[in-house]
Design a protein with these regions (language model features):
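A short, conserved beta-strand element in the Rossmann-like catalytic core
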Residues: 51, 108-112, 239
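Short catalytic helix/loop segments, enriched in acidic residues and glycine
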Residues: 11-31, 253-261
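Conserved alpha/beta core of the MobA/IspD/sugar-nucleotide pyrophosphorylase nucleotidyltransferase superfamily
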Residues: 160-229
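Conserved core of the sugar-phosphate nucleotidyltransferase
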Residues: 110-185
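HAD-like aspartate-dependent phosphatase fold
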Residues: 229-345
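N-terminal nucleotide-binding beta1-loop-alpha1 segment
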Residues: 1-11, 226-227, 231-237
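Short beta-strand-to-loop acidic/aromatic patch adjacent to the donor-nucleotide binding site
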Residues: 99-110
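Conserved N-terminal catalytic core of the sugar/cofactor nucleotidyltransferase
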Residues: 7, 21-100
Length: 345
């Protein structure tokens, strides 16, 4: 969070970008795959310059309260950019007098794992379980039969297991002592350098297997992730059920389910990547009847907009680097056709 976000040009700092399904900050989502009850305190380390420019703090604290993390969270501000994640952690430990076990988590990725031990550890995932990944941007580790890390290397593929941006250190002070050996180096000091140095002097690190890894490390990867998520505005009459009317038969509530469309839309929604907003020109007075009808035919949805004018509908949405063009599109489906799947790209 205190880095340069150089791989996210012309956007807010990457950790402030909005998650496409929850509308939370990227950084908030990045930690929700961990069993956070394991920790007594959660520190978010930011630049004072980011607060001065974006005034994010009040909104961030409200968000932390919404997800139940406010009481154990602290936002720490640094006066200037650090040269590495290691330096950021070092400065935090020193300024907050942190002792004992620490777990360092990248803000630009997500994974699930259960932490139940305060030993030295490295969270990892396997290349064979991913379809697409920029392998050259990762650090890699080798494990022996006892799950002990025997080697860790930055930006070079030495095995199929790579670090996912989660590192546990049994002793925060040992981390600092090791970092001080590197702090005057001209190049960036990666956390993997700290780990390798500690291993050379006798410390053991263990692998912590993770699931559901999501890589948000570059703007390209983030936008690719965002494109997997959709918000569909779906008209009811003629799309979900055969066209019905409040004025003449077939009356509202008597339309036949367009089962092919219903099944397809429910599949999308069940992926947890698609939100469905049903729209209709039916009057607000028919909301409860419409909800009962959707329940009866098994159509899942997230929101329902009633009372729209019966005319051409146009979606207007902004686009930007963080929400690239095209940020919206439309599908014109023949009335009462149940072939929506064929029109959906």
């Amino acid at each position: 969070m205190a880095g340069q976000s150089s791989r996210f040009p012309n956007t807010r700092p990457k950790w402030m970008l909005t998650h496409p399904s929850t509308n939370r900050f990227m950084v908030t989502e990045s930690i929700l795959g961990l069993n956070l009850d394991f920790f007594d305190q959660i520190y978010f380390v930011c630049l004072q310059d980011h607060q001065d420019k974006y005034m994010f703090l009040d909104g961030f604290l409200r968000e932390l309260e919404d997800v139940g993390l406010y009481e154990k969270s602290k936002v720490a501000f640094l006066p200037e950019k650090t040269r590495s994640q290691s330096e950021t952690v070092y400065q935090l430990i020193k300024s907050e007098n942190i002792e004992g076990f620490i777990f360092i988590k990248d803000s630009d990725g997500f994974f699930k794992c259960n932490l139940d031990d305060t030993k030295n550890q490295v969270a990892y995932f396997d290349l064979n379980d991913l379809d697409n990944i920029n392998a050259r941007t990762k650090s890699y580790l080798q494990l022996d039969v006892n799950n002990v890390v025997t080697n860790i290397v930055e930006k070079r593929v030495i095995s199929s297991t790579f670090c996912v941006g989660g590192y546990g250190f049994e002793d925060a002070l040992e981390f600092c002592d090791t970092y001080e050996k590197f702090k005057d180096l001209s190049q960036e000091c990666y956390v993997s350098h700290i780990i390798f140095e500690m291993m050379l002097f006798g410390s053991s690190f263990y692998g912590t297997k993770t699931t559901q890894f999501k890589d948000w490390g570059t703007l390209t990867e983030w936008n690719k992730f965002k494109r997997e998520h959709k918000c569909l505005f779906v008209d009811i009459d003629g799309t979900i059920v055969t066209n019905s009317s409040i004025h003449f038969p077939p009356y509202v509530g008597t339309g036949e389910p367009l089962q092919g469309n219903i099944d397809f839309l429910n599949e999308l929604r069940d992926s947890d990547k698609v939100a469905i907003v049903l729209t209709t020109s039916r009057p607000e007075s028919m909301r409860e009847a419409t909800i009962r009808e959707m329940k009866r035919i098994g159509m899942g949805f997230d929101s329902l907009i009633m009372g729209l004018p019966h005319c051409e509908r146009i979606v207007i949405n902004d686009f930007a680097n963080s929400n690239p063009y095209p940020s919206c599109r439309a599908i014109n489906l023949p009335r009462n056709s149940d072939k929506l799947r064929e029109f959906f790209e």
